[in-house]
Swiss-Prot record:
Organism in which the protein naturally occurs: Burkholderia pseudomallei (strain K96243)
InterPro entries: Ptrans_KptA/Tpt1, RNA_2'-PTrans_C, RNA_2'-PTrans_KptA, RNA_2'-PTrans_N
Native organism taxonomy: Bacteria, Pseudomonadati, Pseudomonadota, Betaproteobacteria, Burkholderiales
The entry's keywords: NAD, Transferase
Transferase as UniProt keyword: yes
Highest taxon in the source lineage: Bacteria
Pfam families hit by this protein: PTS_2-RNA
Protein's name according to its UniProt entry: Probable RNA 2'-phosphotransferase
Amino acid sequence: MSSSYFIATRASKFLSYVLRHRPDSIGVTLDAQGWADVSELLTKAAAAGMALTLDELKQVVAENDKKRFVLNDDATRIRAAQGHSVDVDLQLPVKAPPPVLYHGTVGKSMADIRKQGLTPMNRHDVHLSPDRETATRVATRRGKPVILVIETYPLLRDGYQFRVSDNGVWLVPEVPAKYIKFPG
């Protein structure tokens, strides 16, 4: 692996931490929709030991395989696409999901999921993937993946609303266990 890969990975993790969970850790302010001023972010990131140029920031945003970050059109503001634990309203419109979505998890979480369903944990929403491959990639980070199938029509019928983030992750407040198809 090249040193630029490790720098990009480190920068991505830093940005995730700051833009999703702890903007206060470096003194950055997020607006109500989760946007941070790029100039302020770059200045305060450098003071915290994560010096990035605007071009490097744009590269991290463009090349992040999960498209975790979004820059506005003139690259003056940035936000995380989803996954916030801080209070933000991404103002994503309600949208009809595909008939089936997927959630990647690991075996050690299954007992709790069977009892409680999928809950947002420390986030605002449950994250669902549009395909099995993405769900597998998400789960593999934490161990041997277990893929759960969510048929969305029953959730829609019962009043659940879905939103889709800028990077294609489907968001829903919760998925009770009765809506989950568990593997054999």
